Amino acid sequence: MDVQPATRRLILSTATRFFDPLGLICPVILPFKIMFQNLCKAQRDWDELVDTELNQGWLSNLSDLRLAGRVRFKRCYSEGLGENEVKSLQLHCFADASEKADGAVVYMRVEYESRVECEIMASKTD
């Protein structure tokens, strides 16, 4: 991704660029959505360059986005789900909200006879 000076249009484009139906990269995309909301509230033009402080946040968020490319998620939540040794399977949902955004995440916890596995299943922000 080329680093360009931040504008309202570019921030929205970045926030909506990714196909993420399970919401696994929501924490990385959320700062772009919040920046866009703030620019809308300030009634900034679509192609107007943001001020220096917001541009620093833009650059920091882009850096986080690049680092997120290194994160890997398993396609299979738990390799041993078909095994007889499953003692319990639980879904844990956590949610929180603020004035700027809200979010929720769901984890699956599988307890086996000899181990416990916990994997993220999905998340959502607004």
Map each language-model feature to its residues.
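Conserved acidic
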Residues: 1-126
